[in-house]
Amino acid sequence: MQKTSKKCMMLIVCLIATTAAMAQWRAGVTVGAASNSLDIDKQYQYDWRYNNRWGMDFGAVGQYDFTDWFAVRAELNYLQRGYSQHRTGMNAGTEYKYRHNYLVMPLMASFSFGGEKLRGFVNGGIYGGYWLSGSVKGGFKEHEDDGIVLPIDQDYDFNSTRDNRWDFGYVGGIGVEYRWAAHWAAQVEARYYYSVTSITKDYMLIKDGRYNSTVSLQAGVFYIF
């Protein structure tokens, strides 16, 4: 019994030592573009149409590789999310183009597979974010008959009763990594952010939930310690 226990302990120690020997840190930067749309129940807004908008996505990455196939990854990213909305019918001419700037922090598990130089990977986890600032452009048709559209070009004016600036959700991605040197690697990734918090609070009798849905295409360079 004692011999069996000793063998088990030795096996555990060997596994820990092997994992520690293979483990390594890496740090890097990423840059890309993001397309955002709103998941929204328009309800009474029958004459409004919503479309996606593109923005920037860039940030810093830290990753700890436990093995050659499993790692934990944390990021701090600047993510631009936007959308446009316009009216149809008699109110055609009214249009707003929003751009919202977020600071987001994804925390993900990363699973990789493939050869020594060229590898595929899948990331998945959660994120938290904060709505830093925004802008709105477009035009407002004041009267249905005269056809005059008043231009709009200004910073977004936050309203604490209406706007929910904290954001939380799920994030996942798939990509390819190429390691061209002992300590250097490059990645390309397609990523999806799914928000579970509305950008608007429940401040009206009729619920007006609006949820960001963001697809990001990005490339990054990493230094492996």
Describe every region a protein language model picked out.
Residues 37-53, 80-102, 131-167, 198-212, ...:
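Extracellular/periplasm-exposed beta-strand and loop segments of Gram-negative cell-envelope proteins
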Residues 23-27, 68-72, 103, 116-122, ...:
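Outer-envelope beta-barrel architecture signal
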